[in-house]
Amino acid sequence: MKRAVVVFSGGQDSTTCLAQALHQYDEVHCVTFDYGQRHRAEIDVARDLALKLGARAHKVLDVTLLSELAVSSLTRDNIPVPDYEPDADGIPNTFVPGRNILFLTLAAIYAYQVKAEAVITGVCETDFSGYPDCRDEFVKALNHAVTLGMAKDIRFETPLMWIDKAETWALADYWGKLDLVREETLTCYNGIKGDGCGQCAACNLRANGLNHYLADKPAVMAAMKQKTGLK
C-alpha cells in the first residue's frame, strides 16, 4: 500500500497537493501545525477540508514554541502584515525562520510512524516570495539529512516547485477542485477565507494567478501538464 503525509495548512497550495495525493496514493495522512500564527483560522479550515476530501487521518501538532523563537508578522500581533509590493526586495517580515525545517522534520517523523513513503509539501520556487525555505535546494538538503538521520527512505515531494500560481490553479482544476480551492481554502495572511483581504502578498499572488488562469485556460493548462508530466 502506498502511503503519503501531506503538510496541510488548508491553503490553496496544500489543498491542491492533497487533491493530487488522494489520486496517487492509497492512503493519505494530513498534518497541520499550530505555531501561534496570526491566521490560526487556517487550522479549522484544514481540519474541515481534510475530512471533506477524504484523508485517512488528520493530525494537528502544537508547535507554539516556534512563535516564541521566530519573530515575524505572522507570529506577532504587534507587527503589521505588509501590503503587497511587487517590487519589494529581500526577505519579507512574513517569513517565519525555521518553519519549514520544523514542519518537514516533524512530518517525516509522522511518516515514519505510519509507514508512509513520502512527505508532500506545497512549497514553490517560482512564487517563493523571498522565503529561503521554499527553495528546491533547501528541500533536497533537508530530505537528505532526514533520510540519514532516520535510516529510512522517506521522500520529500514538491509537486508545485516549478509551476507558478496560474498553473497551480490549473492543477486544482485538473483534479476537479477549482471551485473548492477558490471558495473554501484560506491563504490570506490576515485569516480571511476564500478571496481573502485582497491586500497581503498571499492574496495578491493567489488572485493574480487565478485571473491569469481564467483569462487563458488552455495555454496555462497545457503548460502545467508539460511541467508536471500529467496527461
From Swiss-Prot:
Q: Origin, by domain of life?
A: Bacteria
What remark does the entry make about the cofactor? Binds 1 zinc ion per subunit.
**Broad class of enzyme this protein falls into:** ligase
Question: Which sites bind Zn(2+)?
Answer: 188, 197, 200, 203
Instruction: Give UniProt keywords alphabetically.
Output: ATP-binding, Ligase, Metal-binding, Nucleotide-binding, Queuosine biosynthesis, Zinc
Q: Which Pfam families match?
A: QueC (PF06508)
According to UniProt, the reaction catalysed is: 7-carboxy-7-deazaguanine + NH4(+) + ATP = 7-cyano-7-deazaguanine + ADP + phosphate + H2O + H(+)
Cofactor field: Zn(2+)
- Listed pathway(s): Purine metabolism; 7-cyano-7-deazaguanine biosynthesis
| UniProt GO molecular function | ATP binding; ligase activity, forming carbon-nitrogen bonds; zinc ion binding
Q: What is its EC number?
A: 6.3.4.20
Q: Where does ATP bind?
A: 8-18
> Single Gene Ontology BP term?
queuosine biosynthetic process
Q: What does this protein do?
A: Catalyzes the ATP-dependent conversion of 7-carboxy-7-deazaguanine (CDG) to 7-cyano-7-deazaguanine (preQ(0)).
Q: Family assignment?
A: Belongs to the QueC family.
This one is known as 7-cyano-7-deazaguanine synthase
Identify the species of origin.
Answer: Citrobacter koseri (strain ATCC BAA-895 / CDC 4225-83 / SGSC4696)
Upper lineage ranks? Bacteria, Pseudomonadati, Pseudomonadota, Gammaproteobacteria, Enterobacterales
The encoding gene: queC
